[in-house]
Amino acid sequence: GGGGAPPSPGRSSELSGVALTQKLSEKRAAFEERFRATFPGIPSEGGEAEDVARYGLSNMLGGIGYFHGRSRISDQEAGPASQYSHYWEAGLFSAVPSRSFFPRGFLWDEGFHQLLVWKWDRALSREIVGSWLDLLNANGWIPREQILGAEARSRVPDEFVVQRTTNANPPALLLPVLKMAEHLRGLPEGERGADPTHAFLEAAFPRLQVWYDWY
């Protein structure tokens, strides 16, 4: 048996029964209010369009995860799956196209994912874009699929696991970066420097330049 302390009776009562039901109701109402304020162009008040949009956002946010491991890479355009080198050990904070079928980060997809995430939570989007830029090597290349760890590899046929440094996706990750720049341009000049996005883009620019030069 474990040696941990038993849960506090006060804490368990705070998160059960009527108190839990009330808290869930409050959180749901807060989500609905924030959703309608963030996406005012969607027909609201329980319509089908709003339901579909809400499900889409929830699935996107629910698919965000942290992955850790080492990519298998090769500088050859083709070759057997058994011939590869290891990228450095790295973590990635990212959304995924599908939690059940594609539980890994895709560089191309993530640019489009972040157009939605940015509208919902700017700080979260900055964290994710920054996590991808941390995977940039000295030449400006980012492995386009992040197959990190045994769990991610189990969902990928062997012939597609190795990431080849001759291959790249279109730089869709620039799409949310452009949204960030547009956000800053929309602020009064005196407020731009204090916005967290300003510091983020300033720090990210050297990596974005190296990435651009790789293309």
PLM segments and residue spans:
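Acidic, mature catalytic/reactive cores of soluble proteins
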Residues: 1-215
